[in-house]
Amino acid sequence: MNYRIDFAVLSEHPQFCRFGLTLHNLSDQDLKAWSLHFTIDRYIQPDSISHSQIHQVGSFCSLTPEQDVINSNSHFYCEFSIKTAPFPFHYYTDGIKAAFVQINDVEPRVRHDVIVTPIALASPYRERSEIPATDAATLSLLPKPNHIERLDGEFALTAGSQISLQSSCAETAATWLKQELTHLYQWQPHDIGSADIVLRTNPTLDEGAYLLSVDRKPIRLEASSHIGFVHASATLLQLVRPDGDNLLVPHIVIKDAPRFKYRGMMLDCARHFHPLERVKRLINQLAHYKFNTFHWHLTDDEGWRIEIKSLPQLTDIGAWRGVDEVLEPQYSLLTEKHGGFYTQEEIREVIAYAAERGITVIPEIDIPGHSRAAIKALPEWLFDEDDQSQYRSIQYYNDNVLSPALPGTYRFLDCVLEEVAALFPSHFIHIGADEVPDGVWVNSPKCQALMAEEGYTDAKELQGHLLRYAEKKLKSLGKRMVGWEEAQHGDKVSKDTVIYSWLSEQAALNCARQGFDVILQPGQFTYLDIAQDYAPEEPGVDWAGVTPLERAYRYEPLVEVPEHDPLRKRILGIQCALWCELVNNQDRMDYMIYPRLTALAGSGLDTKIPA
């Protein structure tokens, strides 16, 4: 490439840090009539920049220099300030993600990708921490079952072995077991032969519980429900050891039951679009570790990923980002058109795929904040042209909140929620409700008129007005609304709404004390976009510190709540999450998820003793 950016921390102060940016012209031609465009996950103070002007939308920054010529083999330099308190720059991923130079005096405008060198950090480097040595386990089972009785000997599955069904609810689990035995071990059970694996009903077991017995023969998987058989199959798959043409399984008795009814994983597909097969791959892994819920984050400021047949603009416009698109580039892939969406037929495929593995799919449609993709796609319904309110969201947008005073907002909600409710069998529909910035709606004549009509005294009460409409709508469709922690701030929603609490476990318990049912999702332990170490090359964010494998494993939910405290009944379960601002490919996804996912799986299934 002919251009390169060097980016460095010049000075660190308690609130703001000063940065230097150098754009090198490495070509043999002068660079004229240029502008620089790049992404960074921090907000640049617009009045702090030298020798240029800057405009920022989300993570996408456009820099216009005072002198728009860089001679061949010369450079441009500027400085600017970023608020870094309380989160200083620790990682290379804190720096500039991607960049391009645009030539503005020709049509069509020409764009050149720019090499971005790793940020020169001012803070002392931390060496990558070593994972503590551990003793090898005699049995590799994750999560650890409640009861294990190891017996002498092993059972051999041979070329003549087959799977026998003695339960009407075991068929789909048996199909999955066959598929995974073939995929993982290249072993194909026969339709005719010895019934060496038997799945049979045990009505004494609760939903999700199972009994697995291996002695002389046959291998017995017992459960009272489809998901119980899936869990039993997942355990059997971990016990198997290849031995030539056979598979050996240790003689053992395992009794297991989930600790929480809800054991979930959230995947953000809005910040970066993840292809269907990547989504299904994750769901299959969740089944192996006995999760039973896949929370699908389908909409956000950066993209709308679900087909709504009555509103095709949402995916025609809102599913795509790029320099020549309505939505600007964000995070990565700046000079490419990035995005995509899932058709309703593809979503049905995912729902069926997950159901075969005992997993319920919960969709999330994030409102009233995080709605920029929808607003840009449907401005005739969702844009309030008279609103002069000044605000900036936590991701640096000033136009990402739905207006509770526009009739189009309610038409939009009706269309979307009706199609979503018809598409997803899940009783829960996630409505977001998080991170509505201060300052919204205060200078909108329409919103002020609505406040006067309803007797509201604070503009934030309008969020409750909108959420209660969504809650009532979902209830009429036979669904229960769930939302992030902010949904319960103030008198916004009824106690029928389930709260996903992400700030801390103590915050979750406070929600439960108010009478809400709660899903535990403390970011300090369960957010998989959190970096795993303070080494600068480690990808991730650190607003909640770092979460190495050991910390994820040692997380013990509700350890300070007495066993018989009725508050425990309000805790429906636990969930981990992967936000994907920094995740745009399979390798990065795997790195962020594993092995911490396997450690957190135990928090939903077994009771660990904290160190």
Curated annotation (Swiss-Prot):
Annotated InterPro entries: Beta_hexosaminidase_sua/sub, Glyco_hydro_20_cat, Glycoside_hydrolase_SF, Hex-like_dom2, HEX_bac_N
Tagged with keyword Hydrolase: yes
Gene Ontology cellular component terms for the protein in this record: membrane; periplasmic space
Pathway the protein takes part in: Glycan degradation; chitin degradation
Temperature dependence: Optimum temperature is 35-40 degrees Celsius.
A single MF term (Gene Ontology): beta-N-acetylhexosaminidase activity
Compartments, record wording: Periplasm
Key words of the record: Carbohydrate metabolism, Chitin degradation, Glycosidase, Hydrolase, Periplasm, Polysaccharide degradation
Segment forming the signal sequence: none
pH note: Optimum pH is 7.0 with (Glc-NAc)n (n=3-6) as substrate and 5.8 with (GlcNAc)2 as substrate.
Activity regulation field: Inhibited by mercuric ions, PNP-beta-Glc, PNP-beta-Gal, PNP-alpha-GlcNAc, and PNP-beta-S-GlcNAc.
CDD domains from the UniProt entry: GH20_chitobiase-like
Catalytic class of the enzyme: hydrolase
Induction comment: By (GlcNAc)2.
Gene Ontology biological process: chitin catabolic process; glycosaminoglycan metabolic process; polysaccharide catabolic process
Enzyme Commission designation: 3.2.1.52
Keyword Hydrolase attached: yes
Catalytic reactions on record: Hydrolysis of terminal non-reducing N-acetyl-D-hexosamine residues in N-acetyl-beta-D-hexosaminides
Family in the record: Belongs to the glycosyl hydrolase 20 family.
Subunit organization: Homodimer.
Purpose: Hydrolyzes aryl-N-acetyl-beta-D-glucosaminide (aryl-beta-GlcNAc), aryl-beta-GalNAc and chitin oligosaccharides. Can hydrolyze rapidly the artificial substrates p-nitrophenyl-N-acetyl-beta-D-glucosaminide (PNP-beta-GlcNAc) and 4-methylumbelliferyl-beta-GlcNAc, and is slightly active on p-nitrophenyl-beta-GalNAc. This enzyme is not processive, i.e. when it hydrolyzes (GlcNAc)n, both products, (Glc-NAc)n-1 and the terminal GlcNAc, are released before the enzyme attacks a second molecule of (GlcNAc)n or (GlcNAc)n-1.
Protein's name according to its UniProt entry: Beta-hexosaminidase
Annotated source species: Vibrio furnissii
